[in-house]
Amino acid sequence: MSFSIETIKEYGGRGFKCALFDFDGTISLIREGWQKVMIPYFCEVIEALGTNENKDGICEEVTEFVDRLTGKQTIFQCIALDEAVVRRGGEHVDPGEYKKEYLRRLETRIADRKKGLEIGCLSPDDLAVRGSVEFIKVLRNAGIRCFLASGTDEEDVIYEASLIGVKNLFDGGIHGAKDALLDCSKEAVIKNMIEEQKLDPEELVTFGDGFVEIELTAKLGGYAVGVATNEKTGDGIDEKKRARLMLAGADMIIPHFEDTEAILKALHI
């Protein structure tokens, strides 16, 4: 087992009142490998235009915007795909249609995982980021209010949170993507949290593996903890994730939550 904390900027605040968690890749591994569904599908759409571009170049472009928009609602990545198609002279397609097809393909990858959790063949621990469930409980017991915000559709987040066993741990609520909203849901959650809870930004700590929540938290003056879990092995650091999180402005990088005491000590909780 590998565990190390990389502190880029020491926390110097008076203590945390609220914690925001991302879901996929931060708490849940149900959707592990979603990029392996989205990126090839998006590349397939662009290649079908017959522009005779280099396939590696297309893959590089798609990977860049998929990574950059990780953490926002899925529809934003689909909007970026539509823009890439239109730039090449292709027809505009409702990004919602791209999203439907992506989710259909993703479901074939993750259906057995959800079924396994539903019928008890798999334990929630099998598909939770190491130590994450216990860590949330410890924060709650320390009097820190916990919120969950995800770019995944809200109905799916709530259901998958119940499968992992964390649905009832978020006294600040579970917030996911809604079809009617095209604003960044995580930005709204963070700003509402600061306003409604009357927080100084330094009283907010965010845990996430996406560019968006880390960048938003850092810009607003909260403390951003990048969770660079190697989702395939469940242990150690994913260097690509780490690089993305560092670029977003992470104050600290952890591989998972297994060593709760070490994380609490590093955060002065």
Predicted regions and their residues:
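Substrate-recognition element of Asp-dependent hydrolases with the DxDx(T/V) motif
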Residues: 38, 123-127, 132-162, 175-177
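Active-site neighborhood of HAD-like aspartate-dependent phosphohydrolases
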Residues: 2-60
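Non-catalytic pre-domain segments flanking phosphatase-related domains
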Residues: 1-21, 63, 67-70, 87, ...
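Acidic, Mg2+-coordinating phosphoryl-transfer loop and its flanking beta/alpha structural elements
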Residues: 150, 206-252
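A metal-dependent, Asp-based hydrolase signature
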Residues: 64-141
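Conserved Lys-Pro-Asp/Glu-containing loop-to-beta segment of HAD-superfamily phosphomonoesterases
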Residues: 184-214
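A short, structured active-site edge motif that brings together acidic residues
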Residues: 96-97, 167-183
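Short acidic-hydrophobic, aromatic-tinged amphipathic segments that line or gate anion-handling sites
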Residues: 175, 251-259
